[in-house]
Swiss-Prot record:
Natural source organism: Rickettsia felis (strain ATCC VR-1525 / URRWXCal2) (Rickettsia azadi)
Ranges of the ANK repeats in the UniProt entry: 11-43, 44-63
InterPro entries (UniProt xref): Ankyrin_rpt, Ankyrin_rpt-contain_sf
Keyword terms of this UniProt record: ANK repeat, Plasmid, Repeat
Entry protein name: Putative ankyrin repeat protein RF_p14
Length: 63
């Protein structure tokens, strides 16, 4: 059974991926502070940082 904490963490990680891929540095910072995992990977094996870098949002890599 999946716990509510696991579901919440997964939602945070999904939001982090979207924020990183679109260059929303403020959202990335807030999500990391709330517990999003910068090392999590999406279904293609990409991390939030690799999505940010691949989209040209290199300032996110400094977080």
């Amino acid at each position: 059974m999946v716990s509510m904490k696991q579901v919440e963490r997964q939602k945070l990680n999904q939001k982090l991926m979207r924020a990183a891929a679109t260059g929303d540095i403020e959202a990335v910072q807030k999500l990391v502070l709330r517990g999003a995992d910068i090392y999590c990977r999406d279904h293609q094996g990409d991390t939030a940082l690799s999505l940010a870098a691949g989209s040209g949002y290199l300032d996110i890599l400094d977080i």
